[in-house]
Amino acid sequence: KIIFPSTHVVYEGIEDVKTNIKEDEKTKPVLSYSSSKAFNENQLKKSGKNYVILRLGSVYGYSTDSMRIDIMPNLFSKITSQNGTLKLFAGGRQVKSLVPLIDVARCFKFMEEKNNIKSEVFNLTKDTLTVKKVAEICKKNNPKIKLKETNDEVPNLGFSLSNKKLLNTGF
C-alpha cells in the first residue's frame, strides 16, 4: 500500500472562505508545490495500485532536528518563546486547518495496519482556528508578547477541511 502525504494547499485557489471541505471537493492548486501534489494524487489514482492519500492540514509540533518556522503555529511558538510581537495580517481572520505532528505519525501507522482501507483519500486535520485565535493562545501562555493586528491584505482568508471521513474509519 502506498501512503502518500499530500497537502491541504491543493485547495489554495479557493477564493472565498470555505469550511469543512470534503475529500471529493475539486482541488484548486495555484503554486508549484500544490500543483505537484495534485498531479501526484491523480497519478496515484490512475495507477491501479493500492493507495491512501492523506491531505495534511498545517503540520505543527516539536522536531528534534529542524523545525519548520514557515508554518504559522511553529513561527508563533518561536516568537512567543522570545517575548516578541505576533503580527496578524488581515486582523488575523485567516482560517487554518491544523494537525499535530504526532497525529500525522499515528495516522500513517493506522493506515498501514488497516488492510480494508484501499484507494482512498482522507483529510488529516485536528483543529480549525483563525490566526488570531492561535495568537491568543500564545498570549495566554506568555502574557509578555504583543499582538499587532494589521489591515494588510492576504491572498485568501483560508479554508478548513472536514476530517469526518477519517474519523469514521476508527482513527
Report each predicted region and the residues it spans:
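Conserved Rossmann-fold NAD(P)-dependent oxidoreductase catalytic core, especially the SDR/UDP-sugar
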Residues: K1-V30
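Short glycine/serine/threonine-enriched helix-capping/active-site loop
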Residues: P5-S6, L54-L56, L124
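Short, surface-exposed alpha-helical segments at coil->helix boundaries
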Residues: A38-E41, D70, N74, K132, ...
